[in-house]
Amino acid sequence: YKRQGDMSVTLHRAFDVCVDPIETMEQAISLGINTILTSGQRNVCLQGADLLKELVEKSQGRITIQAGSGVGAEVIRQLYPLTGVRAYHMTGKRVIDSEMQFRKDGVNMGLPMLSEYEIWRTDVDNIRAAKKVLEEL
């Protein structure tokens, strides 16, 4: 890895499956990586609060710890006092029902675990609510 110019580099959630998160964080710092996007090695970041707190403390500001997975205004409100995490990654999504009229049961045109009749959209109100919480930190 050779860093080029002023480009900011984020280590994405592959971090969440590493064997030793503290050692991996130290390696990321030594490589000049700016940010680690993580859920604290759990499915959602609120469940990973203990590791997120440890990462923030042990990083001592040398790298940004960015919480992701399950982030919304209420999660930020709960997570910040527990962890000190100040950077968050979120979709701000809202699920809306498809306007498709005919729905054929038993046939899936995509991935079986995803609904054919739901659409995920970024919702401006969810983003505004999260921004408001962040401004109050």
Q: What does each model-found stretch correspond to?
A:
Residues 22-23, 47-50:
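Generic recognition of short, well-ordered alpha-helical segments
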Residues 33-46, 83-104:
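Glycine-rich phosphate-binding active-site loops on the catalytic face of alpha/beta enzymes
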